[in-house]
From Swiss-Prot:
Lineage, highest ranks first: Bacteria, Bacillati, Actinomycetota, Actinomycetes, Frankiales
Name of the protein in question: Chaperone protein DnaK
Database matches in InterPro entries: ATPase_NBD (IPR043129), Chaperone_DnaK (IPR012725), Heat_shock_70_CS (IPR018181), HSP70_C_sf (IPR029048), HSP70_peptide-bd_sf (IPR029047), Hsp_70_fam (IPR013126)
Chain intervals with Low complexity compositional bias: 572-584
Domain of life (superkingdom): Bacteria
Regions of compositional bias (Acidic residues) in chain numbering: 593-609
Amino acid sequence: MARAVGIDLGTTNSVVSVLEGGEPTVIANAEGSRTTPSVVAFAKNGEVLVGEVAKRQAVTNVERTIRSVKRHMGTDWKMKVDAKDLTPQEISAFILQKLKRDAESYLGETVADAVITVPAYFDDAQRQATTEAGTIAGLNVLRIVNEPTAAALAYGLDKGEKEQTILVFDLGGGTFDVSLLEIGDGVVEVKSTSGDTHLGGDDWDQRITDHLIKTFNGQHGVDLGKDKMALQRLREAAEKAKIELSQSSQTSINLPYITASAEGPLHLDVSLTRAEFQRMTSDLIDRCKHPFQQAVKDAGIKVSDIDHVVLVGGSTRMPAVVDLVRDLTGGKEPNKGVNPDEVVAVGASLQAGVLKGEVKDVLLLDVTPLSLGIETKGGIMTKLIERNTTIPTKRSEIFTTAEDSQPSVQIQVFQGEREMAAYNKKLGMFELTGLPPAPRGLPQIEVTFDIDANGIVHVSAKDLGTGKEQSMTITGGSALPRDDIDRMVRDAEQYAEEDRNRREEAETRNKAETLVYSTERFLAENGEKIDAAVKSDVEEKLGTLRGAVAGTDTAAIREAADALAAASQAMGQAMYEQAAQDGAGAPGSGGPADDDVVDAEIVDEEDKK
C-alpha cells in the first residue's frame, strides 16, 4: 500500500512528515535538512531547481527565481519563464514534487496520498489552488487541513481528559492565523479563526531591507533597490539579521562589494540593534492584535478561558511576538512542546494516519527495520533476524570455532542488509571467554538475539558444552537514522551482485580451508591404512589446494577443492573395501570431505593478531 504523508506547504519553508509505527517523523530532504525552502528557480539550461539549491543561486539568477509563491495562491498572478506563463499552482507543484521525491527516497516506497495544510484564513480559491498544486505534483490530496487544527493535533492536546480551549497563534513566513479550538474526548473543534494572509516573516525581512537601502543611499548616494543582484543579497542578509536578533541584542550586516561607483567598489557595513528592529516593525506587531481580538470575540469566550497557547511558525521565535502573545493572553506562557517550524507537518501526518485508518485504538505491532546478525569467518554478515520481522521476537543459531584450541570467540553485532558485515552498521561487540581447548568445529556456541517490544536488542552467546554464557544489551538497536536505513537498502540493491560475489568467495575459501584441515587430520589418523598410490594422489591434490587457498583466484580454489573432495571420497571408498577384504570391522571415518562443521565460523580477533 502506498504511503500517505503530511505536508506543510509554507510561504518560506515547507516540511513533509510521515507516520512510522504510529509516531510522526519529519523527513529530512536530500540536502539533509528537515525544512525545504519554498523557492523555485529555472536554470539557464532548463533545469528546475527547488529548495536550498534554488535559494543558493538566487543572487546570480534573480529574474528566474521565485519565492513566497504561496502569497499568490488563488489569484491570477503568473510568471513568464522562457515564453511560458507559470501559475502559482504549477510553481507550488514543483515544491510538492520535491517533497514527494524526498519522502519516497526516505521511505523506499511510493508516496501517493497526502494531507496538505493551508492557513485557516485561506479562502475557497486559495484552498482549491492548493488542491490543484497537489494534483499537478502527482499527489492524491486526501484533505486540505487548517494549519491550526494540524498544530493542535501535533501537540497531542486532543488526548486531554477534560475539555480544553486552545489558542493557536500561527505567524509564518507570509501568512498569519489566530485560531481558538476546543478539544476533548478526541474531538478537535475550531471555534473561531481570524488572520491576515499577507502578514508574515517576509514583512519583517522587508523592513530590514528597506532600512539597509536607506542607510546605504544616505552614505554613498547609491540606491541599491534598483540593482536586482544587490537587492537579493540584501534580502538574504536581512533574513539572517532577523534570526540573529531573536538570539542577541545586536547584529552586524556586512556585505563587501555590494556595488561599485566611479571611485571603485562599495561595501555595506551596518549595525542593527534589537530595539531599533522592534521600533521599525512595531506596526507589524500591532497588525497581529486585531485578528486575535476578533477570534476571541467570535468564539464568545473570555481571554481567561484559554487553557493553552500554542505558537506555530518560525516568526513566533521573535521576542517581540512572544511578548505580544504573553500580553494578549494575560501573561500565559506558550506551550513549547514541538518545533514551531515542524508542528504543522507533524499534525498533517497524524491527520493522514486518521484518514488511512492508521491512527485509532488498535494494537500497533512494530517491526525491526533492518536485519540483525553477527560477523562470521570471511567477514560474512550472518543474519539471525531479517528486516521487517515483527517485534518482540527471539532467534537462536549455533556456531562453532575456526581455530584449534580457540580460548574465546568475539561476537560482533551488525545491523544492515549487505552480505559483508563491514558494510553494515556495527551495533556492538562482546567476547565469550574461557572455552576449553578443543579442535576447531567441535565447540557449539549458541548465539541468541532477543528484541523486546521497545526495540531494544539483547544478544547472548552460550557455550553449550560448558554452559558458560555472556550477553549484552544494545539500546536503540533499531534506532538508526532513517537516512542510514534507506541508504543501506539502496546500497544493498545497487551492490547486490558485488556483495554476492564477495560472499561466494568467502564461502568457497571457508569450505576449502575446512576440507584441507579435515583431510590432513584424516591422513594423520589413518595414513598407514591407506594404499600408497591413493595416499600419494590425495597428498598431491591437498598440496594443490593449499597453494590455491594461499592465493586469490576463487575459481582455482573451487577447482582444487573439487579435485581433493573426489580423491578423498575415493580414498574413503578404498579403505572400506580393504577393511571388507580383511574381514576386519575396524572403525574408520567414512571420508573426510564433509565433517559436520558449520561453515559460518567465528574468528577470535585476538587470535589472529
